[in-house]
Amino acid sequence: MNAPLPESIRKALETVTLDDKYTLGEGRAFMSGVQALVRLPMLQRQRDAAAGLNTAGFISGYRGSPLGTYDQALWAAKKHLAANNIVFQPGVNEELGATAVWGTQQLDLYPQSKKFDGVFGIWYGKGPGVDRCSDVFKHANMAGTARHGGVIALAGGGTVSYTHLT
């Protein structure tokens, strides 16, 4: 019942840290789904760096999103995000968050002030917020993304909105 652990397992357990979910380059890292969404832009930044690109990330959305604790997890990982040139700025509402993320894709319009080769963005919100952002999404889609940019939209269903129950 309390048999000693094999040396290899004991050593592996001694090296585990709570930051592994954001810093481990290979092997197993245990994390929740929300923590995986926090790690996602860090992995994109590392992929870009391996391709010789100097990119940054920008995350915005609505704090009332059903993606519970996403904003809290982003704040908790602030030092890891900053080390990868990733900024988290929550929006006052879904539309302002989406508009801010869309703005990151206009980097190529101002080549004289470019600090980065590209900026990738993440927008998050609730289902009704997707409806509210349709104008921003339509215009952003028509404008496209920066050459070395791109955007991911994460949406969760609102618990009181029958049209968006998940």
Language-model segments: which ranges?
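Cofactor-/ligand-binding subdomain signature composed of acidic, glycine-rich
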Residues: 2-32, 43
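Glycine-rich phosphate/diphosphate-binding loops that line cofactor/substrate pockets in enzymes
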Residues: 13, 38-55, 110-116
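Gly-rich Lys/Arg/Thr-decorated short loops/hinges at beta-loop-alpha junctions or inter-strand turns
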Residues: 14-25, 52-55, 76-84, 117, ...
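Active-site nucleophile and cofactor-binding loops and adjacent substrate-binding regions
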Residues: 30-31, 60-65, 86-99, 123-128, ...
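Anionic-ligand anchoring segments at beta-strand to alpha-helix junctions in alpha/beta enzyme folds, i.e.
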Residues: 52-96, 115
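Active-site-proximal alpha-helical scaffold in enzymes
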Residues: 102-110
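Conserved small/polar residues in nucleotide/adenosyl-binding loops
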Residues: 163-166
